[in-house]
């Protein structure tokens, strides 16, 4: 972006200057509305989410057999919700900032099959595509026991079709493993940030991995191009897919059930704050949509991004969405948080969700490494760097009197609050890689 344009952007949006300087930045969204007002802009409804629930239930018998690690849960791919009181104390001590309310962790980092939040959307979209093909071919009815998809006849049928996706790692992992298990031929286009172990794991499942020297945007574009030339190839579009988004949104009702089980209340007097790491936006966008449908105006969602990849904060704050990239303002999009190394946000998610999100913030790689170490020490939970992005949120919210006043939170409401950090990945990180992460924390 030439200087004159850049200066006028900063004059209009002074916060951009902090982003350019790679400062850890928090922006509380002044444009947040009620669910009733914001919902029409999403273009999806509660019914769409119910359909996704139903589809995952139909596939449960199949998943229970195809992936024995899901059998105990009856073929439902869900993660634990745990309190992390020792980490809460550690954060308060390190930042000299009390966190009122209770701190919880949602362990999508340990989801079965692929060990990340992408096991929600990625697996769901592969299943939805497989179902559509099998129904159209007359091989399946909605009433069938879907475990029949494991038969050689189905394997043979699906092998005529292929799937392609562009990914920084975790989405590729979930789509690759699921597609290969069903019988699709699958190609994952991996950006330069992708970890070597993720590529190796995919190849061990018989997935074709194409590597790029460039970032996420290039990998997605190349994947899209490769798929266009083959009518039997289905491209899973992380930037624009409504299906992926709905796969994530199912988490809202599931979390509501977990809260009920644990006797946790969410209402006007007991607000829920949720902190979601954000890459291109599909995962956190879908989850936030599901949370809003489940908890209404009593849930407050925040997106967290690396200082080197603040694409969603930049897009929503300036209103330019996918018309601007972090590279346009001179930011390099290089971060240890490989899952969040995205320079241009999803225009679909930004426009759909901007009224339903309370805020956005950035944090440095070093902050993520530090918190990764603290969580391992205090709670014995090991995550990958990007999964810690949400952990900086509670202290930002508790420190901002202006945000609390904007939403009219009383001291008592904040004392009764639940702060939920969404841990997005790390359950499958190899030991020696994890030790390298731990060594970088202070």
Curated annotation (Swiss-Prot):
PROSITE patterns: DEHYDRATASE_SER_THR. InterPro entries: D_Ser_am_lyase, Ser/Thr_Dehydratase, Ser/Thr_deHydtase_PyrdxlP-BS, TrpB-like_PALP, TrpB-like_PALP_sf. It is an enzyme of class 4 (lyase). The keyword Lyase applies. One of its GO terms (biological process) is D-serine catabolic process. GO terms for molecular function: D-serine ammonia-lyase activity; hydro-lyase activity; pyridoxal phosphate binding. It catalyses: D-serine = pyruvate + NH4(+). The modification N6-(pyridoxal phosphate)lysine is found at residue 118. Keywords: Lyase, Pyridoxal phosphate. Its cofactor is pyridoxal 5'-phosphate. Its EC number is 4.3.1.18. The keyword Cell cycle does not apply. It holds the Pfam family PALP. Belongs to the serine/threonine dehydratase family. DsdA subfamily. Monomer. This is D-serine dehydratase. It comes from Escherichia coli O81 (strain ED1a). The gene is dsdA.
């Amino acid at each position: 972006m030439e200087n004159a344009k850049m200066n006028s952007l900063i004059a209009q949006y002074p916060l951009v200057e902090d982003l350019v300087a790679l400062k850890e930045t928090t922006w509380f969204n002044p444009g947040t509305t009620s669910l009733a007002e914001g919902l029409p802009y999403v273009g999806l409804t509660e019914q769409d989410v119910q359909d996704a629930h139903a589809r995952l239930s139909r596939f449960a018998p199949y998943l229970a057999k195809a992936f024995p690690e899901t059998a105990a849960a009856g073929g439902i791919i869900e993660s634990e919700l745990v309190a992390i009181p020792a980490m809460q104390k550690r954060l308060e001590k390190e930042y000299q900032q009390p966190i009122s309310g209770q701190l919880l962790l949602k362990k999508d980092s340990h989801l079965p099959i692929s060990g990340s939040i992408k096991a929600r959307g990625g697996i769901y979209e592969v299943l939805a595509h497989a179902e559509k093909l099998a129904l159209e071919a007359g091989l399946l009815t909605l009433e069938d026991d879907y475990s029949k998809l494991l038969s050689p006849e189905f394997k043979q049928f699906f092998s005529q079709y292929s799937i392609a996706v562009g990914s920084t790692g975790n989405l590729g992992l979930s789509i690759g493993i699921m597609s290969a298990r069903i019988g699709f031929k699958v190609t994952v286009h991996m950006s330069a940030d992708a970890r070597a172990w993720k590529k190796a794991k995919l190849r061990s499942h018989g997935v074709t991995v194409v590597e790029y020297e460039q970032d996420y945007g290039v990998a997605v574009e190349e994947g899209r191009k490769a798929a266009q030339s083959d009518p039997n190839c289905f491209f899973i579009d992380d930037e624009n897919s409504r299906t992926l988004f709905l796969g994530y949104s199912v988490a809202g009702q599931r979390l509501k059930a977990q809260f009920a089980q644990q006797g946790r209340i969410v209402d006007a007097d007991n607000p829920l704050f949720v902190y979601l790491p954000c890459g291109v936006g599909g995962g956190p966008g879908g989850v936030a949509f599901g949370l809003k449908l489940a908890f209404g105006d009593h849930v407050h969602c925040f997106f967290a991004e690396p200082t080197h990849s603040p694409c969603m904060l930049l897009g929503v704050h300036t209103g330019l969405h996918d018309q601007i990239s972090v590279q346009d303002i001179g930011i390099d999009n290089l971060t240890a948080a490989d899952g969040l190394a995205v320079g241009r946000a999803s225009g679909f998610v930004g426009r759909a969700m901007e009224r339903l999100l309370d805020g956005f913030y950035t944090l440095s790689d070093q902050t993520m490494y530090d918190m990764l170490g603290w969580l391992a020490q205090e709670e014995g939970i090991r995550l990958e760097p990007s999964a810690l992005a949400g952990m900086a949120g509670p202290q930002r919210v508790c420190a901002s009197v202006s945000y609390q006043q904007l939403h009219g939170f009383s001291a008592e409401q904040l004392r009764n609050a639940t702060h939920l950090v969404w841990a997005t990945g790390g359950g499958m990180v190899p030991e020696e890689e994890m030790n390298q992460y731990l060594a970088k924390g202070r």
